[in-house]
């Protein structure tokens, strides 16, 4: 192998390594954004302390599913499978935050039921996530929705 061939090989490997590292940083940055709490810092501890008063029974999860697919129209944005790409979502046209992917293990682990309830009660400014508790569902129905959303996550 000539000196020139060695230099080309080294440069090629450096480019591949550089692209790999850049991609890793982009993925890591995306993960941090996914895990960023949507509850304001001055309310986060209070929200995290709130527990779902309903047990995760098959009947209540099924009620949450009926709400998700019906009255609360969650599937429109979050999709039937909870992956955040509902029928009204075109990722190429969305500016800013895409609808939450409820199947992400890290997100399921990081967010508490109380934080999810806070979002349902307050919406998320700057996104399409509106206030749902009150205008669309009752608080009890919101807890049922949360039980169903948890069913998209990995089994404990």
List PLM regions with ranges.
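Bacterial N-terminal signal peptides that target proteins for export
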Residues: 2-12
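Bacterial N-terminal signal peptides
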Residues: 11-22
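Sec/Tat signal peptide C-region and signal peptidase I cleavage site
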Residues: 23-28
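Cleaved targeting-peptide boundary
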Residues: 29-36
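Electrostatic cytochrome c docking/interface patches
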Residues: 36-69, 156
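Sequence/structural segment immediately N-terminal to covalent heme-attachment motifs in c-type
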Residues: 58-80, 88-91
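Protein kinase-like catalytic domain
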Residues: 78, 150-153
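Extracytoplasmic electron-transfer domains, predominantly the class I c-type cytochrome c fold
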Residues: 93-133, 137-149
């Amino acid at each position: 192998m000539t000196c020139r061939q060695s230099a080309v090989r080294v440069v090629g490997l450096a480019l591949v390594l550089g692209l790999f590292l850049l991609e890793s940083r982009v993925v890591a940055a995306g993960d941090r954004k996914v895990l960023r709490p949507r509850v304001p810092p001055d309310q986060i501890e209070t929200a995290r302390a709130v527990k779902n008063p309903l047990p995760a029974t098959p009947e209540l999860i099924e009620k949450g599913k009926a709400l998700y697919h019906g009255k609360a129209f969650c599937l429109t944005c979050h999709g039937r499978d909870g992956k955040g790409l509902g029928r009204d979502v075109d990722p190429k046209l969305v500016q800013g935050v895409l609808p939450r992917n409820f199947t992400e293990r890290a997100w399921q682990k990081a967010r508490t039921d109380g934080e999810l309830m806070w979002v349902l009660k307050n919406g998320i400014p700057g996104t399409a996530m509106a206030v749902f508790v009150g205008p669309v569902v009752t608080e009890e129905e919101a807890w049922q929705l949360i039980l169903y959303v948890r069913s998209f996550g990995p089994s404990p």
